[in-house]
Amino acid sequence: MRRYLVAASLLLLLTACGTADTPATPAASGGVTPIKLQLQWFFQAQFAGYIAAVDQGFYKEQGLDVQLLEGGVDIVPQTVLAQGKADYAVAWVPKALASREQGAGITDVGQIFARSGTYQVAWKDSGITTPADFKGKKVGNWGFGNEFELFAGMTKAGLDAGKDVTLVQQQFDMQALLKKEIDVAQAMSYNEYAQLLEATNPATGKLYTPGDFQIIDWKTNGSAMLQDAVWANTEKLNDPAYQQQTVKFLAATVKGWAYCRDNPEACRDLVVAKGSKLGKSHQLWQMNEINKLVWPATTAGVGMIDEAAWKQTVDISLTAKNQTGDTVLTKQPTGLAYTNDYIKQALDQVKAAGTDVTGTAFQPQTVTLTAGGA
């Protein structure tokens, strides 16, 4: 089996691209250690826990001065980390594993999202209810490593992505589905799906409702893969100072996510104030949906890597084929792909201070979206 093209290109990215003009700051200043965290997208509630940890002083309590580096379409967080231009990075597990196979020295030290938030969405009257129904249809996807679950679902349904469907490069919005240029579109539960519900149905003059759409949720058919995780520099993890710093960073991060679980409106406001391009109702929806992906956490606590979920992600990465027959990975990950050592120490620390790290009592909100997400 061959690699995905996106994975093959990552070796070049490791030596040719980056987003930060200055390296990760190596030394403490005045007793405070400066840290750069590379996010994988623009500021939005997907990263509210980190934003809150900065705003609420949780990182400062640990002696860390954390700078959040905004992501974007052309930014590969794990590459920025591997190049030494950030101290930590947030990235989806399969994307990062593909980078590791190409030589990136990175390790998952905190699995913040316990669940996948990826959907494929069709019109309710389309007759599309399962991945098998994609046959003969125009199937939208974003690419850039976001499509692995889609290919996993189609592979599991017995479809050949190169022959049985027409793959369409989708923009990071839902206009192609709304205009019926494609039959099924990729969406995140916390972002693009909300954009559909913020759009006006021209036939009624009212906003679309969930009843207008059919969701294919990869969590329900065994094709889900682990997503947002905190990645560290593997080589630096040999340094006791970086090990200690990682525990501190994770402890403050856990507190940030617990704060957003308990204060979703406040975290929504922090995200909007940070310069989010999307409005208040959209960001509250997103905060609520993100909380569903984080909470309840594993019984051991938020950030602990569940071995069964990790195995499923790796197995899919080895077997799901794209339109050219390539897979995400060609072999099992080697070396220190993940470790629970540092997150466990961080959890012990914040639990001792009274923070709820499992969120077993978490209940999602009911969020009312407005036109355009304003």
Task: Describe the function of each predicted region.
Residues 1-6:
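Bacterial N-terminal signal peptides that target proteins for export
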Residues 12-16:
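C-terminal motif of bacterial Sec signal peptides marking the signal peptidase cleavage site
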Residues 17-27:
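Bacterial lipoprotein signal-peptidase II cleavage site
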Residues 26-170, 174-179, 183-190, 216-218:
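Short, glycine-/small- and polar/acidic-enriched structural segments
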Residues 61, 207-213, 217-223, 293-307:
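Short, solvent-exposed loop/beta-turn-alpha elements that line the ligand-binding surface or hinge
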Residues 94, 172-175, 182-277:
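Pocket-lining segment of extracytoplasmic ligand-binding domains
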Residues 239-326:
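Secondary-structure end/capping motifs
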Residues 311-374:
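Conserved C-terminal helix/tail region of periplasmic/extracytoplasmic solute-binding proteins
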